[in-house]
From Swiss-Prot:
Gene3D superfamilies, per database record: Leucine Aminopeptidase, subunit E, domain 1, Zn peptidases
Name of the gene this protein is made from: pepA
Pfam families: Peptidase_M17, Peptidase_M17_N
Co-factor binding details: Binds 2 manganese ions per subunit.
The keyword Hydrolase belongs to this UniProt entry's keyword annotation: yes
Cited PROSITE patterns: CYTOSOL_AP (PS00631)
GO MF annotations in UniProt: manganese ion binding; metalloaminopeptidase activity
Alphabetically ordered keywords of this record: Aminopeptidase, Cytoplasm, Hydrolase, Manganese, Metal-binding, Protease
Source organism of the structure: Brucella suis biovar 1 (strain 1330)
Similarity comment: family membership: Belongs to the peptidase M17 family.
UniProt-annotated location(s): Cytoplasm
Name the record gives this protein: Probable cytosol aminopeptidase
GO biological process: proteolysis
Length: 497
């Protein structure tokens, strides 16, 4: 696995050994502190000139070059136009810097720009970007680390910045969020033969060490609760289902909780409506929503969030054996509503139907947000740079959108409406689980909406962003951990004033 760097903050100093990293603005501008760090402004100019480096955001240039103080390598990191930096740009800068440090044991990053003051929270974002970029899932590779291109040791990184106190304090929070993102990535990257519903639940139970109350419901409890929709999906697999309830109580008094629900199909063959063989291996990631909820609960507990939060994940495997549910079957959900199964590959919404109703009925939350790798249709509509956002509450939708813009985990709102709702009406039951080809992500959301009553609710379709999304400066992993930073920001901005 990846070797996570050790990061500290310091006032400006001249690096004594290892790698010196400095920032360069678009057009070649850099601060006096950067020039001092590398032994002279002419070195920065020469490296930039030889490399054709312009200072564009996220671009880098490097040179094996010594300084009088003992530095062996100099790295330039472009920041673009300093006055326009925002959202996740500082994470990109940190990730780009980390990508160039190689096997260095000591790294000094000088965070200074001409006529610009870099705040402590921006420095913390740079550090977070470095931690997230350091992630690598290779636990099943048996080659030696040097053959696999992995650093021999964890780097010790010193970030020099004007406001060290604020940077340290903010990074303490950011590290807890990084822990949550990394947990989500690990869960999604794990192969399905290793991580089934039982094993996933065991991973969630480890959050008890952080003060999270964890309850795991097995098949008997689910039957007693009447979760026919979830159990219908699970009946084709020899691996028993689980429903995991995670509670974090960080607010004073008996404040109503906020709730997050995740789809956790640990492997999705499609069931009897079986998927094509090509790329089916990616369906180990069909629990990306549950992974994000688990990672979020870890982040909230790790930073001692002052909020009461509930995380509920439905864990099943969708397999096509002789006991699997069939197209045409009718199941009764926990809510009492009946569902005709048109397509067994539209299984995630069945799992969520019972998980959403259970969460709403038991906890009476202020709102519910569910995450699910639910439809390929949302990828057709939005590609892999935005997750789909559906909501019955404009205020909640706006808050989520803003959190997405702030973190770079972007959302785009798609419609709901009675016309779409009619498309899931069934001739034989209260509703059907698939309405056909058109508006697939919308009709899936309409289906979920029937299980939340009047509670403010949002559905995030993360099929295009939780796994296999394009790599960026701070994520080179197949699993992105999408949703953890987004929802943590929502909680901080809106519910921890």
């Amino acid at each position: 696995m990846s070797k996570r760097p050790s990061i500290s903050f310091s006032e400006f100093e001249v690096p004594q050994k290892g790698v010196a990293v400095v920032l360069v603005a678009k057009g070649g501008g850099f601060a006096d502190e950067a020039a001092k760090a590398v032994g002279g402004a002419e070195k920065i100019a020469r490296i930039a000139d030889i490399s054709g480096f312009t200072g564009a955001l996220g671009k880098t240039a490097e040179a094996i070059e010594t300084t009088p103080a003992g530095v062996e390598k100099i790295v330039l990191v472009g920041v673009g136009e300093p006055g326009k930096l925002g959202n996740d740009d500082w994470l990109k800068i940190g990730g780009a810097a980390f990508s160039q440090i190689g096997n260095a044991e000591r790294v000094t990053l000088t965070l200074a720009l001409p006529e610009t003051t870099i705040a402590g929270d921006e420095a913390a974002d740079v550090a977070l970007g470095m931690v997230l970029r350091s992630y690598k899932f290779d636990r099943y590779k048996t080659r030696k680390s040097e053959e696999n291109g992995e650093p021999k040791h964890a780097a010790k990184i010193t970030i020099c910045v004007a406001d060290t106190h604020s940077a340290r304090k903010t990074f303490e929070v950011a590290e807890a969020v990084a822990d949550g993102v990394i947990q989500a990535r690990n869960l999604v990257n794990e192969p399905a033969n290793i991580l089934g519903p039982v094993e996933f639940a065991e991973e969630a139970e480890k959050l008890e060490k952080l003060g999270v109350k964890v309850e795991v419901l097995g098949e008997k409890e689910l039957k007693k609760l009447g979760m026919g929709a979830l159990l219908g999906v699970a009946q084709g697999s020899v691996r028993p289902p689980r429903l995991v309830v995670m509670e974090w109580h960080g607010a004073k008094g008996k404040e109503k909780p906020i709730a997050f629900v995740g789809k956790g199909v640990v492997f999705d063959t499609g069931g009897i409506s079986i998927k094509p063989a090509a790329n089916m291996e990616d369906m180990k990631g069909d629990m990306g929503g549950a992974a994000a909820v688990t990672g979020l609960m870890r982040a909230l507990a790790g930073r001692k969030a002052k909020v009461n939060a509930i995380g509920v994940i439905g864990l099943v495997e969708n397999m096509p054996d002789g006991n699997a549910q069939r197209p045409g079957d009718i199941v009764t959900s926990m809510s009492g509503q009946t569902i005709e199964v048109i397509n067994t590959d539209a299984e995630g919404r069945l799992v969520l139907a019972d998980a959403l109703h259970y969460t709403n009925d038991r906890f009476k939350p202020r709102f519910i947000i569910n995450l699910a790798t639910l439809t390929g249709a949302v990828m057709v509509a939005l590609g892999q740079y935005h997750a789909g956002l559906f909501s019955n509450d404009d205020e909640l939708a706006d808050q989520l959108y803003d959190a997405g813009q702030s973190t770079g985990e972007k959302l785009w709102r798609l419609p709901l409406g009675t016309e779409y709702d009619k498309m899931i009406d069934s001739k034989f039951a209260d509703m059907k689980n698939s309405a056909g080809r058109y508006g697939g992500s919308i009709t899936a959301a309409q289906f979920l909406k029937r299980f939340v009553g009047e509670t403010p609710w949002a559905h995030l379709d993360v099929a295009g962003t939780a796994m296999g999304s394009p790599a960026n400066e701070y994520n080179q992993s197949w699993a992105s951990g999408f949703g953890v930073r987004l929802l943590d920001r929502l909680v901080r901005d809106q519910f921890e004033s």
